[in-house]
Design a protein with these regions (language model features):
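Extended, low-hydrophobicity, Ser/Thr/Pro/Gly-biased non-transmembrane segments
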Residues: 99-127, 142-148, 153, 165-272, ...
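Short, aromatic- and glycine-rich surface loops/edge beta-strands on solvent-exposed regions
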Residues: 165-168, 601-616
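N-terminal, polar/Ser/Thr-rich
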Residues: 23-58, 184, 510-511, 515
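Hydrophobic alpha-helical and helix-loop surface patches within well-folded domains
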Residues: 41, 80, 256, 289-557, ...
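Ligand-binding face of N-terminal immunoglobulin V-set domains in extracellular IgSF glycoproteins
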Residues: 56-84, 88-89, 99-102
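Bacterial N-terminal signal peptides
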Residues: 8-21
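Short acidic/polar inter-strand loop motif in beta-rich domains
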Residues: 85, 172-178, 609-621
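Beta-strand-rich binding/interaction modules
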Residues: 236-237, 509-510, 523-609
């Protein structure tokens, strides 16, 4: 049987007679007790019944949308993300070509259960049943088999500021867990599971297909979601639980509400354990809810401590977390693709039963995913087109917070055998890249998934760490704070971020942005040559001096700009009388020669002695050490270069 046939023979849907009355049962959203934080252009009400045996659900969605575009609209696009998990989708094609491991590992496509989001009926109140007006569109490529973007043609235009209400019946078939959504045994992570309207952005509809390397973009609004599951299943979701009712058929219905968010995810599993605590920050007391696998309970205190520390640092450095709850989901063994993901007020973590204390994976993942609550969740940039504004800025913030919580250089790995810091890992990943793509490239247009992750995450973090060298750590932190306060709930762009940094720094940094963000220039300064010879050897007329301390030496160091990235650099030279000399160079020319004549011999020279230029693509050519003939230093450096390149390639593969 061909895959598509196997897919079409998925378990039957609930009869329409059992689903249609859901609309009548829905109650309006309760009025909020606080002023809206966002524009709230969308209001979703969804009732879903989950079939745990077949990992599918049937749902009724009521969506009220306000036409904020400033012009009449007669066609509207919707995301159907679950349709990415099919053999001929753009996601799958890019996954095989670009090396996305979530698609390739494990069972072959022929042996998997696919994902699908099927529209059963599509109505607009006052316009009638528009199911016949639906068509799939492909704004990013020519793949007619891709069904991740749906367009509805309206019988009349929606006027500016007019509200319309959609009533949609749909059926989801979840895939075996892959790329942020799906099931593993009895565990389910329901992410990107409902029809979601696109965003009007930059005077056009922004509703990209689901790509192998891209995440998401949506408008802010409110959610009222009721999920019916077997009565012995635990449920966690975006927002807060407001009701739970037991049904006569052995199920229960759990209701969650969320405001000023742009997405909604949930999870269910019969075997999980719930751990709860609170943390107090400037905005008040926040409830922390851990949904743990029984075999991972030893990691619960690590998750909790890391999350509390992270929330306090974000509150101190960036701004307040305005929601009353954060939920952390611990995926089961074999459910790795569900781990390390963020949704509003809801994140997934990662650990194993054997996770030892010295390896900070649980802490790193929780810190990183909570950080997304700010850059992805509240600032809410376009992750299809400018993923670095979330992933990269968040990776930088992760480095800083992990430093503060656990200590620099040991905040990723800290054992007797070896240590590793967050920034060192990022640099190792970056070393393994060819730097073929600018940070600003659209997510699906990178040469491959390794380049996407290495550039978007690691290079952006290193770019901001290097920025500290230029304007100072406090200015970078202040710029992050100003950017967050100014643009939360606003969907800003990369230019907004860079202009904010320019403003806070009090200088035009376009010379840096053009190279580090918009360009692909390699930053690499090296010591081309170094020498320290007696002055009387160079000048035959110089008087001979035999007594110690009287012999003069002419020392020379030539620094070479090997890469195309122009950056001011500092050279530190040390002499055998204990003197240390530092000198700066603007780095513009291809090379620069430093020369000293003094009664001391040059013993070492180093570019960037403070190790502050994290974008340096080759740190092994930054130093010179006098050791007689120089062969020993070169040999040792060669061994380290080979080892580091291997490690960099390994980390790049993991990223």
């Amino acid at each position: 049987m061909k895959p598509i046939c196997k897919f079409l023979l998925a378990p039957a849907l609930f009869c329409l007679g059992g689903v249609a009355p859901i609309f009548a049962q829905m109650s309006p959203l309760l009025p909020s007790e606080k002023a809206p934080l966002s524009d709230r252009y969308v209001a979703y009400q969804i009732e879903a019944k989950y079939d745990a045996k077949n990992h599918s659900l049937d749902a009724a969605e009521t969506l009220t949308w306000t036409n904020y575009t400033g012009q009449p609209q007669d066609h509207l696009p919707f995301h159907l993300y679950l349709n990415a998990f099919q053999p001929k989708s753009t996601f799958t094609r890019e996954g095989y070509i670009g090396g996305n491991r979530d698609v390739k590992i494990g069972a072959k496509w022929e042996d998997r259960k696919f994902g699908e989001d099927v529209i059963k009926s599509f109505e607009v109140v006052g316009m009638g049943d528009l199911t016949g007006n639906l068509r799939f569109i492909h704004p990013d490529d020519d793949n007619a088999e891709d069904k991740t973007v749906l367009e509805v043609q309206l019988p009349r235009p929606v006027a500016p500021n007019e509200k319309i209400t959609f009533k949609i019946l749909f059926h989801d078939q979840f895939p075996e867990v892959v790329a942020r959504s799906g099931y593993k045994r009895d565990f389910l992570l329901a992410g990107q599971w409902f029809p979601k309207i696109g965003v009007w952005w930059k005077n056009a509809w922004n509703c990209h297909q689901y790509h192998a390397t891209t995440e998401f973009f949506a408008d802010f609004g409110t959610f009222d979601v009721k999920v019916t599951v077997p009565s012995h299943y635990n449920v966690g979701a975006t927002g807060v639980q407001v009701a739970e009712n037991t049904n006569a058929d052995g199920t229960k219905t759990v209701e969650y509400k969320a405001e000023d968010v742009h997405d909604f995810a949930w999870t269910t599993d019969p075997s999980t354990k719930i751990v709860e605590d609170t943390v107090t920050i400037s905005s008040g007391t926040v409830k922390i809810r851990l949904i743990m696998q029984p075999g991972h309970m030893a990691s619960a205190p690590r998750y909790m401590d890391a999350l509390k520390g992270t929330m306090k640092k974000f509150d101190e450095w960036i701004g307040p977390y305005p929601y009353s709850q954060i939920t952390v989901v611990d995926p089961p063994h074999g459910g790795g693709p569900a781990g390390g993901m963020e949704y509003p007020t809801f994140i997934t973590a990662d650990t194993t039963w054997w996770m030892w204390d010295g390896l900070k994976v649980p802490e790193v993942v929780v810190e990183h995913e909570f950080g997304h609550q700010y850059w992805y969740g509240m600032v809410a940039t376009n992750e299809f087109e400018e993923a670095w504004l979330d992933e990269g800025i968040n990776q930088y913030t992760e480095c800083k917070i992990m430093d503060a919580l656990y200590g620099r250089d040991v905040d990723f790995l800290n054992t007797r055998v070896a240590t590793a810091g967050e920034r060192g890992v990022d640099h190792a990943v970056y070393l393994g890249l060819a730097d073929l793509d600018p940070i600003t490239r659209y997510g699906w247009k990178f040469i491959d998934s390794n380049s996407y992750s290495g550039i978007t995450y690691s290079k952006t973090a290193l770019m901001l760490l290097t920025l500290e060298h230029i304007i100072g750590e406090q200015k970078v932190r202040e710029a992050q704070h100003v950017y967050f306060e100014r643009y939360r709930f606003k969907h800003p762009t990369g230019d907004d971020f860079m202009n904010t940094v320019n403003e806070v720094a009090g200088q035009n940094l376009d010379w840096y942005w053009n190279q580090a963000v918009r360009g692909t220039q390699i930053l690499d300064y090296r010591i081309l040559s170094a020498s320290s010879d007696r002055a009387d050897w160079a000048d035959k007329n110089a008087p001979k001096r035999e007594k110690k301390g009287e012999t003069e030496y002419i020392s020379s160091v030539v620094v070479h700009r090997k890469g195309d990235f122009i950056m001011p650099v500092t050279l530190e030279a040390k002499f055998d009388d204990g003197e240390t000399v530092r000198d700066s160079w603007d780095g513009v020319d291809r090379w620069h020669r430093y020369t000293w004549q003094k009664k001391a011999k040059l013993v070492s020279a180093e570019i960037d002695p403070d190790h502050a230029i994290w974008l340096d693509h080759d740190v092994f050519n930054n130093s010179w050490l006098h050791d007689g003939d120089g062969h020993a230093t070169g040999k040792i450096a060669g061994y380290w270069m080979v080892a580091t390149q291997w490690f960099a390639q390994f980390l790049s593969w993991l990223a």
